[in-house]
């Protein structure tokens, strides 16, 4: 399936720094960069104010660049609990901003993105930056790392979108076939039940019209 022209917004979620990017799919595996940047919120501000700023900034990007789909990193953090919570808050705001605009959201783990971009699910940030710079034909490496990560997410979705669509279509086709089979099975059962009922009715009518061989015939009146 051709996804040429698909515009993807990649987001590397974070409350202090949130990487944003927009790319557009070309033919084959060609991807064109549209924009890249980072949204920052002051660490000394109230959580609600930081989330509001993030939501407004990301919303402006979505409105200005009109992406077709959003790709967000699915973060698995085992470190500082506070950092984990802040990132989770940020992800919630990002998904909400997309939902308000009717934009579908796809989430990818860091290893999925690394595998798609470099072929190595354990590639380090330097390797990823080199690869994304080469893939997009950039004159210089995107900075900071959050921006490079956002671009990698967007490119990852461009390359995986055809596979996701084929998988989704296969699932829809299988569900359609399952329903067709259930419908045919239901009709077959109904037909079989109708035949069985007709057979039972016919047998009953036959028995009613013919005396049993064990029944004694009426004796003639001796008079």
UniProtKB/Swiss-Prot annotation:
Subunit structure: Homodimer which binds Holliday junction (HJ) DNA. The HJ becomes 2-fold symmetrical on binding to RuvC with unstacked arms; it has a different conformation from HJ DNA in complex with RuvA. In the full resolvosome a probable DNA-RuvA(4)-RuvB(12)-RuvC(2) complex forms which resolves the HJ.
GO BP field: DNA recombination; DNA repair
Subcellular localization(s) per the UniProt record: Cytoplasm
Entries under PROSITE patterns matching the protein: RUVC
Basic and acidic residues compositional bias, start-end: 213-223
Keywords: Cytoplasm, DNA damage, DNA recombination, DNA repair, DNA-binding, Endonuclease, Hydrolase, Magnesium, Metal-binding, Nuclease
Gene Ontology cellular-component annotations: cytoplasm; Holliday junction resolvase complex
Span list, region Disordered: 182-223
Protein's recorded name: Crossover junction endodeoxyribonuclease RuvC
Chief localisation class: cytoplasm
Family named by the database record: Belongs to the RuvC family.
GO molecular-function terms, A-Z: crossover junction DNA endonuclease activity; DNA binding; magnesium ion binding
Binding locations of Mg(2+) 1: 12, 146
One Pfam family from the record: RuvC
Cofactor note: Binds 2 Mg(2+) ion per subunit.
InterPro entries (UniProt xref): RNaseH-like_sf, RNaseH_sf, X-over_junc_endoDNase_Mg_BS, X-over_junc_endoDNase_RuvC
Signal peptide start-end: none
Binding site for Mg(2+) 2: 73
Cofactors required: Mg(2+)
Enzyme's top EC category: hydrolase
Function: The RuvA-RuvB-RuvC complex processes Holliday junction (HJ) DNA during genetic recombination and DNA repair. Endonuclease that resolves HJ intermediates. Cleaves cruciform DNA by making single-stranded nicks across the HJ at symmetrical positions within the homologous arms, yielding a 5'-phosphate and a 3'-hydroxyl group; requires a central core of homology in the junction. The consensus cleavage sequence is 5'-(A/T)TT(C/G)-3'. Cleavage occurs on the 3'-side of the TT dinucleotide at the point of strand exchange.
Record-annotated active site: 12, 73, 146
